[in-house]
């Protein structure tokens, strides 16, 4: 009896799921990872969140990126469910400029104010990710992919900012914020 149960457990553990339709598993995960990496607006904002969190330091270093990812997932679920959220595209564009300015000007608000600002913008980005998902893509895998890609972009911003701070090159962080503002202006003008 023990051998039968052990064999059944091994066979169960060794099996892989069979999907009757394409777009599940690895394909969905890859689509989720790719989505934030294919838009300059998304890249700029997600790196800017990391930059701003590193400028603030302490709790903001993890609270602000975690807020963005968490609220973005809520927005993604709303988008996938086709729940309308007003002003998504203008909100995304405003987020590029606003977060770039917050970094460029080294604005230092209380952590909860940053959470509110970041949360509002994350809803827009998440909704865009969710609304643009293909019908044949698995939602959980897709959302996992875009959450990991987003967290990675935050980590890039944090890593850059912390490296610049250690090298006494804090103005480089603020310059990166100014680049975000320019990206936002370029997107608004239609040249990017």
Positions of the model-derived regions?
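Membrane metalloprotein/metal-transporter helix-bundle signature
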Residues: 2-192
């Amino acid at each position: 009896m023990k051998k039968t149960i052990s064999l059944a457990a091994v066979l169960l553990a060794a099996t892989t799921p069979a999907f009757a339709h394409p777009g599940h598993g690895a394909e969905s995960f890859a689509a989720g990872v790719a989505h934030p990496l294919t838009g300059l607006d998304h890249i700029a904002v997600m790196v800017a969140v990391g930059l701003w969190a590193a400028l603030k330091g302490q709790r903001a270093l993890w609270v602000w990126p975690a807020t963005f990812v968490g609220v973005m997932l809520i927005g993604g679920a709303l988008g996938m469910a086709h729940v309308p959220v007003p002003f998504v595209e203008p909100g995304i564009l405003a987020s590029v400029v606003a977060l770039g300015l917050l970094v460029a000007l080294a604005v230092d608000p209380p952590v909860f104010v940053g959470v509110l600002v970041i949360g509002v913008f994350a809803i827009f980005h998440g909704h865009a990710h969710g609304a643009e998902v293909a019908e044949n893509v698995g939602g959980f895998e897709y959302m996992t992919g875009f959450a990991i890609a987003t967290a990675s972009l935050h980590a890039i911003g944090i890593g850059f900012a912390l490296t610049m701070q250690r090298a006494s090159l804090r103005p480089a962080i603020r310059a990166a914020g100014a680049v975000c503002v320019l990206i936002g202006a370029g997107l608004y003008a239609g040249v990017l």
